[in-house]
Amino acid sequence: MRFTFRPLHPHFVAEVTGPRLQDVHEPADLARLRAAMDQYAVLVWHDQPFADDEQLDFAQRFDGVLHARTSLAVLGRNRFGNDALTDVSNVDEHGDIMAADDRRRVSSVSNRLWHTDASFVDPPGRYSMLSARVIPPVRADTEFADMRAAWDALDAETRAQIEHLHAHHSIAYSRQVLGFEFDAAERDKLAGVVQPLVRTLPRTGRRALYLASHASRIVEWPVPEGRLLLRDLIEHATRPEFVYAHEWHVGDFVIWDNRSTMHRARPFDDRAHRRELRRTTTLDID
């Protein structure tokens, strides 16, 4: 099958044209897409609608085991009854726009912070795939930042200082930053994990910063200095020259590599407009 890749940014991101992904089954075709992910880190399709079962099937064909340990799973079953299909929306189980004080909505607001999916579990997330089902009539973009280019742009002294450090990641921390509180039982399920601050990508050998708002501290440093370092690195890594903003349209499908990027949702009036997307994320295992 023939795929065409059109770069959308000087460092990363490409728009893909070619066959419907529901029809992509051959190992060679899937390998071609994975090679493109190694190069671009974010791939964008337009006019690529999915039914839920089709998206789940493709995600498993593309990269295997799916992540199902989201913060919303701790708050209760999602409206699809399958935690491997993350409900990225402002819609409740009755099909209504969520109330302003709905805990799921309040938790999801933290997605406006820069993050990488599932860095707070072991194994973490590898590829995330987001399918646009209902898009508001106003901009409600997702921004992506290239962590490989951000690493490349660091000076040699900073690289040497940070390359062997580790950060503790917890989704409870990133939610608490914005005032969301989990109860004791919920916190027990969200203890978090330690991740390297810098990762080496296995197929390319490129290095990338591994950052997220979930990162609460640097394990090897005192908490104040570690948090200041994390803030400085996120500020560096999200400079405009490293960022691509995706304007969503119904039928868009975007895959990104969580080892190579961070992303964040941009705000819109979620009390006036519906926004429904479905996300699948694979686990970073061999």
Question: What is each model feature region?
Answer:
Residues 2-255, 259-286:
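Fe(II)/2-oxoglutarate oxygenase catalytic core
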